[in-house]
Amino acid sequence: MIPVSRFFTVQDPSNALLSYTQKGIDFFEKLGQFSKEKAAIEEEYSTKLRSLAKKYAKKSEEDDEILKSVSYTSSFNSFLQQLDQIATRHQTSAEHIRGGVVSYVASKTCQMRSSRKNAINDLKTINDKLEDQINEMCKSGKCYLKSFKDAENSYQKFYKADKNLEISRLELEKARALANARNEACELAKQDYSALVRKTNAEQKRYHVELLPVIFARLKAVDKECIADMRQVLQKIVSFDDSLADSTEECRKIMQREVGKIDAEGDAQLVLKSVEATIEQPAPFEIEDLGDPKNCDSRTNDSADGSGGKLLKSSPSKNRIIRNFLGILKEKEADEKPEASNNDQLMYTDKSKPAHVRLSCLRSKIRDMEKQLEQAIQGREGITRLQQAYYTNPQHGNPSACTEPLISYAKKIEKLKMDIHNLKEFYAMLEMSVEEGQERSFGGRDTPDTTRSMSGSSTNQSSSKTIEDVLSGEAGNSSSADDSSKNILRQLFTTPKRLISSPKTSKSSTPTPLRRRAEISSPKILRSSFSGAIRKSLSTPDSVKVETAVTVTALFEFAKSSAETMSIEQGEILLVLEHDHGDGWTRTKNCRKHNEESGFVPTSYLQFPQ
């Protein structure tokens, strides 16, 4: 008989092949996990690198104009920009790996697992079919073996009965007939077994020659595809790294070029010139003539008699000489404070000084005033808390004692806010004029400029002054820091609109209002505050008509001061013709039947409907 164990010898190579294919797919999936973690590392590195560049870019933003002008600051800013570009390249590489490798590995892994599973199912099917055929053959062999043994026993009994003379002839014939019948049954079982053996052999041959090689070929294709995908994935990762290296190499070349632009001699010379520009020329030392030493007796007698003799001046100390040389005045002496204020004012009004020095001095003045404002606000809050504590516990103190300090703080805060606001507006104008190449001139008219100006009024009536002329004239007349700031800005901010004439529009001598500055050239930048925040000035029509009639009530009396203004009385009903554009003036028309008049009035004098 054919041993059944011969079939199961095929299972060992099949299991080994299936195990190897599974390990290949697992390894391919591990490459996908590796790519995913590599992309995460690239993304994390990009985030940290971008945060680093952003952090030091903020630290490099200095308020000092000198540091903004030196080459190493601009080079370092360019260096940080390229560093941010490198971070962007790493971010892009991570996105490419995540989109081109990780997703590809995931889809191919599912596809190969499905192909392997189908091959395993087909292999199991042909194995089961061959196993059933072998089991049927074995069952037929058992039947043939049983029939053979039965026939053999029948013939042994027949031969034994034939030798026994005591057995009748009838019993002998029965034994012979039984043996022959058993022999025929054995022959039939043998034929069935032989047929099943031939069929099983044919099926086994077909299994090993036709079916099994096909399954192995399919598993081989899966394994081959898996290995090819491994190579493709690794090549993609290398190509992404090569692209990243090329792009970062370009950024590093730009970094080297920007670093090479650092000029040590030029930066040092620029700083030196800026510092020298801030040094005031000190007054020359005067020779103190003490007189003739021979007249010492007369000077002694004069002093003894009480007559007014000449007092010997003490020689200046070393510190005072150094301060005099550097142009630094004592701030501790009360009589020298106005002079120091005038010197600071002349610092940013002197046209011969560099622009960044003038802006820096003005910025320092505004910063000092903001510190004073903050201290005043904190003092008022402290007095308010103290007064509240007195109200809560009257035994601790009298709450009315805090009223006078609160009023004083309120006046001081209001005054500081007004001065800071005026200086900030002046700073914005000065900075804008410096950026455009030369300082714009502004008019001193008392009425707003409008395209609907009344007949007979001329926009050329006001005389234009430069910023330096106004500031220099006010600097000579001011006596203190606060009065100086008021006098400086008196001509700047008492008119409804500041009139600015652009150097690019030399064809017309008519000043242009600030709110229609955008018509000079496009685009223009309107600096709205000292903080440096800018907004683009949108082009608007020269005059905005009021679509619906708006009536307002005059709160106070106002006297006409120029051709474009009008007089109003308290409680008078007015009709609004043009709204306030931010300059503090509104064009209105009275409702008088016999004396109809229109013109500009202060917006704060009007009460608008709710």
From Swiss-Prot:
<keyword id="KW-0963">Cytoplasm</keyword>
<dbReference type="InterPro" id="IPR036028">
    <property type="entry name" value="SH3-like_dom_sf"/>
</dbReference>
<keyword id="KW-1003">Cell membrane</keyword>
<feature type="compositionally biased region" description="Low complexity">
    <location>
        <begin position="501"/>
        <end position="513"/>
    </location>
</feature>
<comment type="subunit">
    <text>Interacts (via SH3 domain) with wsp-1 and abi-1. Interacts with cdc-42 and (via SH3 domain) with wve-1.</text>
</comment>
<dbReference type="GO" id="GO:0007165">
    <property type="term" value="P:signal transduction"/>
</dbReference>
<feature type="region of interest" description="Disordered">
    <location>
        <begin position="499"/>
        <end position="519"/>
    </location>
</feature>
<dbReference type="InterPro" id="IPR031160">
    <property type="entry name" value="F_BAR"/>
</dbReference>
<feature type="compositionally biased region" description="Basic and acidic residues">
    <location>
        <begin position="291"/>
        <end position="302"/>
    </location>
</feature>
<dbReference type="InterPro" id="IPR011072">
    <property type="entry name" value="HR1_rho-bd"/>
</dbReference>
<feature type="region of interest" description="Disordered">
    <location>
        <begin position="283"/>
        <end position="315"/>
    </location>
</feature>
<feature type="region of interest" description="Disordered">
    <location>
        <begin position="436"/>
        <end position="487"/>
    </location>
</feature>
<dbReference type="GO" id="GO:0055037">
    <property type="term" value="C:recycling endosome"/>
</dbReference>
<dbReference type="GO" id="GO:0097708">
    <property type="term" value="C:intracellular vesicle"/>
</dbReference>
<feature type="domain" description="SH3">
    <location>
        <begin position="547"/>
        <end position="610"/>
    </location>
</feature>
<dbReference type="GO" id="GO:0006897">
    <property type="term" value="P:endocytosis"/>
</dbReference>
<comment type="function">
    <text>Plays a role in protein trafficking, actin organization and embryonic morphogenesis. Potentially acts as a cdc-42 effector. May play a role in egg laying. Together with toca-1, is required for protein trafficking regulating yolk protein clathrin-mediated endocytosis by oocytes during oogenesis and retrograde recycling and the sorting of recycling endosome cargo proteins such as mig-14. Also, together with toca-2, controls the distribution of actin at cell junctions.</text>
</comment>
<feature type="domain" description="REM-1">
    <location>
        <begin position="352"/>
        <end position="429"/>
    </location>
</feature>
<comment type="similarity">
    <text>Belongs to the FNBP1 family.</text>
</comment>
<feature type="coiled-coil region">
    <location>
        <begin position="355"/>
        <end position="385"/>
    </location>
</feature>
<dbReference type="GO" id="GO:0048613">
    <property type="term" value="P:embryonic ectodermal digestive tract morphogenesis"/>
</dbReference>
<dbReference type="GO" id="GO:2000370">
    <property type="term" value="P:positive regulation of clathrin-dependent endocytosis"/>
</dbReference>
<dbReference type="GO" id="GO:0032956">
    <property type="term" value="P:regulation of actin cytoskeleton organization"/>
</dbReference>
<dbReference type="GO" id="GO:1904703">
    <property type="term" value="P:negative regulation of protein localization to adherens junction"/>
</dbReference>
<keyword id="KW-0968">Cytoplasmic vesicle</keyword>
<keyword id="KW-0965">Cell junction</keyword>
<dbReference type="Pfam" id="PF00018">
    <property type="entry name" value="SH3_1"/>
</dbReference>
<feature type="domain" description="F-BAR">
    <location>
        <begin position="1"/>
        <end position="267"/>
    </location>
</feature>
<dbReference type="Pfam" id="PF00611">
    <property type="entry name" value="FCH"/>
</dbReference>
<keyword id="KW-0728">SH3 domain</keyword>
<feature type="compositionally biased region" description="Polar residues">
    <location>
        <begin position="475"/>
        <end position="487"/>
    </location>
</feature>
<dbReference type="GO" id="GO:0005911">
    <property type="term" value="C:cell-cell junction"/>
</dbReference>
<keyword id="KW-0967">Endosome</keyword>
<keyword id="KW-0175">Coiled coil</keyword>
<dbReference type="InterPro" id="IPR001060">
    <property type="entry name" value="FCH_dom"/>
</dbReference>
<keyword id="KW-0472">Membrane</keyword>
<protein>
    <recommendedName>
        <fullName>Transducer of Cdc42-dependent actin assembly protein 2 homolog</fullName>
    </recommendedName>
</protein>
<keyword id="KW-0254">Endocytosis</keyword>
<dbReference type="GO" id="GO:1901046">
    <property type="term" value="P:positive regulation of egg-laying behavior"/>
</dbReference>
<dbReference type="GO" id="GO:0005886">
    <property type="term" value="C:plasma membrane"/>
</dbReference>
<dbReference type="GO" id="GO:0005737">
    <property type="term" value="C:cytoplasm"/>
</dbReference>
<feature type="compositionally biased region" description="Low complexity">
    <location>
        <begin position="453"/>
        <end position="464"/>
    </location>
</feature>
